[in-house]
Regions:
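Conserved alpha/beta-domain cores
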Residues: 1-210, 214
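Short hydrophobic targeting helices and cationic amphipathic motifs
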Residues: 217-219, 224
Length: 225
């Protein structure tokens, strides 16, 4: 797979002189840094040999999926090796809740009736549980590697409510099924606008607190001096 990816990128760059592809190779189902290092070393050795044999130059990146809870917990360690994270929210949801999407359909209806769950965790990201893991991993990853690229792949990447949450915790991109792309783009734009409006409101509030109005100062003087 590594040879195929690198060869494809080299061929494209050769045919299109104005293009400069930098392939990203993602390692799935990682939960231990030693495991990530082992696989990443194989990828680098293979990729570098292909590049050297072609007497070419090519920059590539190695990252990992964050799709098991342990990976989210040790994300700071994984970021020492990984240049990017992609949160696989389908598997992360399954492993966090302890049931699969296939099994969920057999009992989630009863859970809704009993008000145990308000919504399908495979349709809308569980912000209190799965979302907390994502936020923790994002913060830990950025603490280790400031410029780490963070994204999401899975059905949640096309859900507007989930996209707004991903925006709030600082993820850079979402990927989803092709038919969800238009909705995802609209939701991402709306989430960015909302986030920008909130920041402006916070800055305005902070300025107001730093500069009390003349009326407030007058009342303070009248009552306390």
């Amino acid at each position: 797979q590594t040879r195929a990816i690198i060869n494809a990128a080299l061929d494209v760059n050769k045919k299109h002189k104005n293009w400069h592809l930098e392939p990203e190779i993602m390692i799935p189902l990682v939960g231990e840094k030693k495991e990530l290092d082992y696989v990443a070393n194989i990828i680098r050795t293979t990729a570098d040999k292909v590049i050297a044999d072609k007497k070419a130059n090519l920059k590539y990146h190695i990252g990992t999926m964050i799709e098991i809870p342990r990976a989210a917990v040790v994300a700071g360690e994984l970021a020492e090796t990984a240049e990017f994270f992609s949160f696989g929210t389908n598997d992360l949801t399954q492993m966090t809740f302890g049931f699969s999407r296939d099994d969920a359909g057999k009992f989630l209806g009863d859970y809704y009736d009993k008000h145990i769950y308000e919504s399908d965790p495979f349709a809308h990201v569980d912000q209190n549980g799965v979302g907390a893991l994502i936020k923790m991993a994002a913060n830990s990853g950025r603490a280790t590697r400031k410029n780490i690229h963070l994204g999401v792949c899975g059905e949640h990447g096309g859900d507007p409510a989930s996209i707004e949450f991903f925006q709030r915790v600082g993820l850079d991109y979402v990927s989803c099924s092709p038919f969800r792309v238009p909705l995802a783009r609209l939701a991402a734009a709306q989430a960015a606008i909302h986030a920008d409006a909130e920041k402006k409101a916070e800055r305005k509030s902070a300025k107001t607190l730093k500069k009390p109005s003349k009326k407030i100062l007058y009342l303070i003087r009248q009552n306390y001096f």
